[in-house]
UniProtKB/Swiss-Prot annotation:
The lineage of its organism: Bacteria, Pseudomonadati, Pseudomonadota, Gammaproteobacteria, Enterobacterales. Pathway: Amine and polyamine metabolism; carnitine metabolism. FAD binds at residues 255-283. NCBIfam families: PRK03363.1. Pfam families: ETF, ETF_alpha. This is Protein FixB. It comes from Shigella flexneri. One of its GO terms (biological process) is carnitine metabolic process. Required for anaerobic carnitine reduction. May bring reductant to CaiA. It comes from the Bacteria. Keywords: Electron transport, FAD, Flavoprotein, Transport. Heterodimer of FixA and FixB.
Amino acid sequence: MNTFSQVWVFSDTPSRLPELMNGAQALANQINAFVLNDADGAQAIQLGANHVWKLNGKPDDRMIEDYAGVMADTIRQHGADGLVLLPNTRRGKLLAAKLGYRLKAAVSNDASTVSVQDGKATVKHMVYGGLAIGEERIATPYAVLTISSGTFDAAQPDASRTGETHTVEWQAPAVAITRTATQARQSNSVDLDKARLVVSVGRGIGSKENIALAEQLCKAIGAELACSRPVAENEKWMEHERYVGISNLMLKPELYLAVGISGQIQHMVGANASQTIFAINKDKNAPIFQYADYGIVGDAVKILPALTAALAR
């Protein structure tokens, strides 16, 4: 048996749902989707869900993760085994841990490939900071996985599909986290996972002000702007949501133009699936050139304006 009888899907990020649903179609005979509202439920059915389970009644001061108890109860009531797919987000990982405990299931994070053999999930993911690939065969009846971005292609919606909708009512957990305040966060409005062309900057760009040169190039060629982890996490020059690497975005664009990025393995595992990699770096020995299809050795601050002018013609 190379599929599970049932798979359960939940995504706290709507843009990740099509990818998870495509994976669900390949891994199980029946697809169940937990959703937070009617619009997400309709989307899940169009993407292939046979049953939609609307999570309902959570007080405003409680966390989405506190639905874990009723989610686990619902999963157990409808089968003695099964697969749970979640996005590899912070909330996805926290929810995976809670579900794993309640289902007595093995949990595997950052899955980059998933297959089923003899009714058991086999998962591969990066280990040792991206230096190797680890493989796990999950022996527990339930398997809870968080899926790295780009693991599956996005499922295409079909408005003719039909499915059944159910309601799962909130039950307060014995121990809960109460939200006392919220603060709006300026988040990335661009879905980099879907970008055809990506210009990504590293600390070699020199300063936050010089990022404007990369933005001008993006505008000239219709690309989206990304960055390395140090630019986002250390220098705070760009948003966390835009950094590429093993612990965040895993991209597969047609073109990845790396500007001032050294090319450490932790970054390249997030970009190495690109169809074409073009690197600009003043260090001719930078590791990025081992991955690049094309490269220019030189100062990015001087090269970017010339490249933008040439491509804008």
